[in-house]
A protein has these predicted regions:
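N-terminal secretory signal peptides and thylakoid transit peptides that target proteins
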Residues: 1-14
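A short helix->beta-strand "capping" segment at the edge of beta-propeller domains
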Residues: 30-47
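Beta-strand-rich domains and repeat architectures in extracellular enzymes and scaffolds
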Residues: 42-71, 94-96
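Surface loop/turn motifs at the tips and blade-to-blade linkers of beta-strand repeat domains
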Residues: 42-47, 87-91, 128-132, 171-175, ...
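Repeated scaffold domains used in trafficking and secretory/extracellular systems
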Residues: 48-53, 93-99, 134-140, 177-183, ...
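Residue-level signature of beta-propeller blades and closely related beta-rich strand-turn architectures
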Residues: 67, 111, 153, 196, ...
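Short, conserved, GDST-rich strand-edge loop motifs in beta-rich repeat architectures
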Residues: 450-456, 497-512
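Blade-level signature of beta-propeller repeat domains, shared across WD40, Kelch, NHL, RCC1
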Residues: 618-649
Length: 649
């Protein structure tokens, strides 16, 4: 097994190396009194090479990327130990699904959902189909060469016939469920793993008849999110108890539920049945397991990369390959060795990704992305990679410590300048997975982190961390049937802005976002109301002077709220949608991703100080960071980090 530190440092150093050539930040930090709105380009915000899936054809591993523009499939030739070519996939924000038919590799994208064929002999890429559903999550080919796709919103199964170039809609295996997350196909059936409420459905390929295979004893599980198949067995990874379901295809009543043994294991993320064994990977631990079908013995083979997500497990010439972000682990059953192959070091494309968060501690700027954050040193222009197995969604600096809220697991990490790794403080649990904001209350000394629940689950949560006591406490629900999206805190009270969406895929049951107050001493909700009619989200909150709170809504409106009277006193339409908002004295700054606006809080008027950003934020959620000097903002133009000079008054 490769030690965790070596894995993190190797992956981080390799990705960051691609960014060292751009060093414009040095001059930017020392410039004096630049006119407000002056932009300084600091180069790519976050450079990464995250993988989403892979497939073998002969001695070549074809690996697909996520979050690049365009995304690519890189051909890693095992014999040459290098990535010899890339195939551009021009649409979609990522590649989650791949399969092969003969020597052709099929690639499924998401947002938008297109199907591509890579002719590996001719070296040609052809778009062969498109689908109305939001995501293509999973694909598998049948023995007779048809391609089956599982999609989401709604959870649907499609069949693509390469011989005719036509697609057939096989419908929703479990009507009302939003996700088909895993799929396999044999001569007779297509097997679909469903979420957010678990189902395992067999669909007759000829008649379309559907049959539930999931045993009643596990019908209360959340997902069948990964699947492997042999001639005789199916194996499905179930959430959220870290369980593997193994059943006989001919007699589904004969089944076993295998519990992953790593502490806190919740998800089985990839499954392969090969040579009498079920190989599978878990999260959050990143542990790699093997279950023997004949003896029912479970083995822990190692932790190839601590906490990493394994997207796919493949067998090739006697070895087992696991596809992870920018890397592949290789297990040799004959020797028990577990090796690590960094594809970026072997030529896989590293490129600017869609950033997820931005934050400045005054000396450096953190930009969160897949698998960690790029850290831009403002004095030297040097960029380093802080590797974390997850996605930093929100950051906050208190003293000499920067806190990071990490998806998945709704985890809180801490990073101190000069350290090569961030330290895990806690995972939220409580069916939460997506941190939304961070705030610090000086009165109580608490770090406050709101989170969104896992797909299909109700009620977001609010977690409180005390650095002094080392305690981490979670409260759920806080605002009933909503997610807390934004937070600020002062004098022992946290002010909360909500999002009507609970877990993804779960239809909202409320119509309007709320503003609420939560007492950090008594841990009670004090009040809640709806500040902007019809707003889906309160994207950001900021405290002003004299008991005034400001917020930005998904409608692009900024509102002023009197905390004493608990009334909205003024509103102004600023942007096209909600983004970050900061108050500096008698002015505020906010963004909708396209422009940065300055608001005069006395006259309550606004003007754009920067236009044309066209920030390519992951998920379309625009972010903004305020330098502690209050003389600069950090934003994203396209996929580059930019410094914006401001007057701060």
């Amino acid at each position: 097994m490769i030690p965790r530190r070596r894995f993190l440092q190797a992956a981080a150093a390799t990705t960051a190396a691609a960014t060292f050539t751009t060093t414009p930040a040095r001059a930017a930090t020392h410039q004096k009194a630049q006119p407000e709105g002056t932009l300084t380009d600091l180069g790519p915000a976050s450079v990464a090479s995250p993988l989403g899936n892979g497939e073998f054809v002969g001695g070549v591993l074809y690996a697909g990327s996520r979050g690049l523009s365009p995304n690519v499939v890189g051909a890693f030739d095992l014999g040459q130990d290098s990535v010899t070519t890339h195939f551009d996939i021009p649409t979609g924000v990522g590649i989650w699904a791949m399969c092969k038919v003969g020597t052709d590799v099929y690639v499924g994208t998401h947002a938008r959902s297109d199907l591509y064929k890579i002719d590996t002999i001719a070296g040609q890429v052809t778009k062969v189909a498109e689908y109305p559903d939001h995501y293509i999550w999973t694909m598998a080919s049948s023995p007779d060469g048809k391609v089956y796709l599982g999609t989401s919103e709604p959870g649907r199964v499609w069949e693509y016939d390469p011989a005719t170039g036509t697609s057939r809609d096989l419908g929703q295996p479990a009507p009302g469920e939003a996700y088909v997350r895993s799929i396999q196909a044999d001569d007779t059936y297509v097997y679909a793993g469903i979420g957010a409420n678990a189902h395992l459905i067999a669909i007759d390929r000829r008649t379309g008849e559907k049959r539930e295979l999931l045993p009643a004893a596990v019908a209360d599980r959340d997902w069948v999110s990964s699947m492997g198949m042999s001639e005789t067995h199916l194996a499905g990874g179930m959430n959220s108890l870290g369980e593997l379901l193994v059943l006989e295809k001919a007699a589904p009543q004969n089944y076993k539920v295998v519990k992953a043994t790593a502490a806190g294991e919740k998800y089985i993320v990839a499954v392969l049945i090969h040579d009498g064994y079920v190989y599978f990977a878990g999260r959050p631990s990143g542990t790699f397991y093997r279950y023997h079908l004949a003896t029912e013995k479970l083995e822990v083979l190692g932790v190839p990369y601590f906490e990493a997500l394994t997207h796919r497990i493949l067998a090739h010439e006697g070895r087992i390959y696991g596809i992870q972000d920018s890397a592949v682990f290789v297990y040799d059953p004959a020797t028990g060795s577990l090796d690590y192959v960094n594809l970026v070091q072997r030529g896989f494309k590293a490129a600017p990704e869609e950033p997820m968060s931005v934050h400045s501690d005054g000396r450096r700027v953190y930009v969160g992305g897949k698998g960690g954050a790029d850290v831009h040193d403002l004095a030297t222009g040097k960029v380093t990679r802080l590797g974390i197995s997850g996605e930093p969604k929100t950051l906050l600096t208190v003293g000499d410590t920067t806190y990071l809220g990490i998806y998945t697991q709704a985890a809180l990490y801490a990073h101190r300048p000069g350290k090569t790794e961030a330290d895990l403080i806690a995972r939220t649990g409580n069916q939460q997975d997506r941190p939304r904001d961070l705030a610090y209350d000086a009165t109580t000394g608490l770090i406050v982190m709101p989170t969104q629940p896992e797909p299909g689950h109700m009620n977001g949560a609010l977690s409180l961390y005390s650095p002094r006591k080392g305690t981490y406490e979670t409260y759920r629900p806080v605002v009933e049937r909503q997610t807390v999206y934004s937070v600020v805190a002062r004098h022992g009270v946290a002010y909360l802005g909500t999002l009507i969406q609970e877990g993804l895929g779960l239809p909202p049951v409320t119509t309007t976002a709320r503003l609420a107050a939560f007492d950090l001493r008594t841990r009670k909700l004090l009040w809640q109301l709806e500040p902007i009619p019809g707003a889906r989200m309160i994207s950001s909150l900021a405290l002003g002077r004299n008991g005034t709170l400001y917020g930005m809504a998904s409608t692009g409106e900024v509102f002023e709220f009197d905390l004493r009277s608990r009334k909205v006193t003024r509103t102004i339409k600023v942007g096209t949608k909600g983004g970050e908002l900061f108050v500096t004295g008698r002015v505020a700054y906010c963004t909708d991703g396209g422009s940065i606006y300055k608001i005069d809080l006395v006259a309550f008027t606004s003007k754009a100080i920067v236009d044309g950003l066209a920030g390519q934020w992951f998920g379309g959620e625009p972010k903004l960071a305020l330098d502690p000097s209050r003389r600069a903002l950090y934003a994203v133009r396209a996929r580059n980090l930019v410094r914006v000079a401001i007057a701060g008054r």
